[in-house]
C-alpha cells in the first residue's frame, strides 16, 4: 500500500511541477513583455500583402468528407501495423479479428463510393420540372 501511494505521489508531484512551470512561464512572459500596440501591429498579416476580403471563406463540404475518409484509413494503418509485426504469434483468431476490422472499413468506403462522396466533380442532377398551372387572366 505504501509503495502504491508513493508511486501516485510521484505522479502528483510531476503534474504539480509541470503546472507550476507552465503557469510561471506564462506569467513571467506576460509581466516582462512590452505592450506597445499600434495600428500596423494590429493589422491582419497575409503573406506580406494587404488583406483582401474577409477571412470567412465558405469551403465545400467535400473537402471535409475526403479529409475524414483519409483520417479513417490513416488510423486503420496505425492499428494494423502493430498487428502485422506480431502476426505469427497471434494465430488465426487475430487474423479473423483484423479481417473483420478491415471489412467494416471497406464497407464504409464502399458506402461513401456509392453515395458519390469520392467523386470530386459531380454531374449536375437532372431534376424534372413540374408543369405550372395555367395563370388566370385578369
Swiss-Prot record:
Care to name a GO molecular-function term for this sequence?
Answer: NADH dehydrogenase (ubiquinone) activity
> Which reactions is this enzyme annotated as catalysing?
a quinone + NADH + 5 H(+)(in) = a quinol + NAD(+) + 4 H(+)(out)
Provide the Gene Ontology terms for cellular component: NADH dehydrogenase complex; plasma membrane
Q: Where are the transmembrane segments?
A: 8-28, 63-83, 93-113
Q: Where in the cell is it found?
A: Cell inner membrane
Please indicate which superkingdom the organism of origin belongs to: Bacteria
Q: Which InterPro entries match?
A: NAD(P)H_OxRDtase_bac/plastid, NADH_UbQ/plastoQ_OxRdtase_su3, NDAH_ubi_oxred_su3_sf
Record's bilayer topology term: Multi-pass membrane protein
- List, alphabetically, the Gene3D superfamilies matched: NADH:ubiquinone/plastoquinone oxidoreductase, chain 3
| Keywords tagged on the record | Cell inner membrane, Cell membrane, Membrane, NAD, Quinone, Translocase, Transmembrane, Transmembrane helix, Transport
Location (main, coarse): membrane
Per the UniProt entry, the Enzyme Commission number(s) are: 7.1.1.-
Protein family? Belongs to the complex I subunit 3 family.
Q: Subunit arrangement?
A: NDH-1 is composed of 14 different subunits. Subunits NuoA, H, J, K, L, M, N constitute the membrane sector of the complex.
Q: What is this protein for, i.e. what is its function?
A: NDH-1 shuttles electrons from NADH, via FMN and iron-sulfur (Fe-S) centers, to quinones in the respiratory chain. The immediate electron acceptor for the enzyme in this species is believed to be a menaquinone. Couples the redox reaction to proton translocation (for every two electrons transferred, four hydrogen ions are translocated across the cytoplasmic membrane), and thus conserves the redox energy in a proton gradient.
**What protein name applies here?**
NADH-quinone oxidoreductase subunit A
Amino acid at each position: 500500500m505504501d509503495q502504491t501511494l508513493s508511486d501516485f505521489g510521484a505522479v502528483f508531484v510531476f503534474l504539480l511541477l509541470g503546472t507550476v512551470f507552465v503557469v510561471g512561464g506564462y506569467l513571467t512572459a506576460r509581466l516582462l513583455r512590452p505592450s506597445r500596440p499600434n495600428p500596423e501591429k494590429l493589422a491582419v498579416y497575409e503573406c506580406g500583402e494587404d488583406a483582401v476580403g474577409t477571412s470567412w471563406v465558405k469551403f465545400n463540404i467535400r473537402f471535409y468528407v475526403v479529409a475524414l475518409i483519409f483520417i479513417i484509413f490513416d488510423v486503420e494503418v496505425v492499428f494494423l501495423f502493430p498487428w502485422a509485426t506480431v502476426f505469427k504469434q497471434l494465430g488465426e483468431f487475430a487474423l479473423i479479428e483484423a479481417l473483420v476490422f478491415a471489412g467494416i472499413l471497406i464497407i464504409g468506403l464502399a458506402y461513401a463510393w456509392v453515395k458519390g462522396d469520392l467523386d470530386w466533380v459531380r454531374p449536375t442532377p437532372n431534376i424534372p420540372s413540374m408543369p405550372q398551372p395555367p395563370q388566370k387572366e385578369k
